[in-house]
Curated annotation (Swiss-Prot):
Record InterPro entries: Heat_shock_Hsp33 (IPR000397), Heat_shock_Hsp33_C (IPR016154), Heat_shock_Hsp33_N (IPR016153), Hsp33_helix_hairpin_bin_dom_sf (IPR023212)
Function: Redox regulated molecular chaperone. Protects both thermally unfolding and oxidatively damaged proteins from irreversible aggregation. Plays an important role in the bacterial defense system toward oxidative stress.
Keyword Zinc recorded: yes
Protein species of origin: Ectopseudomonas mendocina (strain ymp)
Gene name linked to the record: hslO
GO CC term (a single one): cytoplasm
Protein's UniProt name: 33 kDa chaperonin
Molecular function GO labels: protein folding chaperone; unfolded protein binding
Key words, A-Z: Chaperone, Cytoplasm, Disulfide bond, Redox-active center, Zinc
Main location: cytoplasm
Length: 295
């Protein structure tokens, strides 16, 4: 399995972890756009982060990470569903991006929004400044500054692989004394901080855990598959056209030379609607779906 998340627990301390490995879904996202290497790396890190966060949540819905700035990289966005389906996109000015560009040069004065959109229930959004040296530090800062469980991230991507590690301190169970809990938490963090980029990207999960925590009692759970999937569809595109109203849809059809084309920014899928399709959209509630003709 090339794309998966995997949970682990420390038996003697109140800490849990999550690891993510992405290859095929990451390649699928990069294949849709000719991203510069620094952008591709950041996008991979954000994909890994989104998958890590979904692994810590019990919900049915969508998690969205969206970073915005007024720099060379104006938008970085990843969605991960509770079904562990990922997609991502970036908007950038290639002429302003150097080969060694980092987060701060790409997205100066940026902000990161973390949105949890459940199928049922209230939508939640948290916002943090992109003021860390990398995305992992920004996310860790968000959890440190909010009323969340203490959480740390380690993220790496190289244009072919994206990997992530998350550690989270749980409410008291094995340990109740605050100083003991803090010492245990600091201990697992200190060991994780010794990870190199090569190790995080290259080691399989059992080997990585043994490398870090061979003196601890750690339980590693089964792998949970992750995959790329875009939620766009012809039906959604048709609904977007229908929402314009018949007069505006027909005007758009005329302006575009007899065929309205809607492109998905995430996957580059193209949905085309001709005059017959537009007429069918407004033919009444009992009409059939638009034809499957594409141009």
């Amino acid at each position: 399995m090339n794309d998966f998340s995997q949970r682990f627990l420390f038996d003697d301390t109140d800490v849990r972890g999550e690891m993510v490995a992405l290859r095929e879904s990451y390649a699928h996202v990069l294949a849709k756009h000719a991203y510069p290497q620094p952008v591709a790396q950041l996008l991979g890190e954000m994909m890994a982060a989104a998958a890590l966060l979904v692994g810590t949540l019990k919900f049915d819905g969508l998690l969205v990470l969206q970073a915005r700035a007024e720099g060379p990289l104006s938008l970085l966005m990843v969605e991960c569903s509770s079904a562990r389906e990922l997609r991502g996109i970036a908007r950038y000015d290639a002429e302003q991006i150097g080969a060694d560009a980092d987060l701060q040069s790409l997205m100066p004065n940026g902000v990161l929004a973390i949105t949890i959109d459940p199928s049922r229930g209230q939508r939640y959004q948290g916002i943090v400044d992109l003021d860390g040296v990398d995305l992992a530090e920004c996310l860790s800062n968000y959890f440190a500054s909010s009323e969340q469980l203490p959480t740390r991230f380690w993220l790496k991507a190289d244009g072919q692989r994206a990997r992530g590690l998350l550690l989270q301190q749980l409410p008291p169970h094995h340990q109740s004394e605050p100083q003991e809990r803090q010492e245990s938490w600091n201990h697992v963090l200190t060991l994780a901080d010794t990870l190199t980029a090569e190790e995080l990207l290259g080691l399989d999960n059992p080997t990585l855990l043994h490398r870090l925590y061979h003196q601890e009692n750690v339980r590693l759970f089964d792998e949970q598959p992750l995959q790329f999937r875009c939620s766009c569809s012809r039906e959604r595109s048709a609904s977007a056209l229908a929402s314009l109203g018949q007069a505006d849809a027909e005007l758009l059809l005329a302006e575009q030379g007899g065929s309205v084309v809607i492109d998905c920014q995430f996957c580059n899928e193209r949905y085309a609607f001709d005059a017959a399709d537009i007429a069918q959209l407004f033919a009444g509630a009992g009409s059939e779906a638009p034809s499957q003709t594409r141009h």
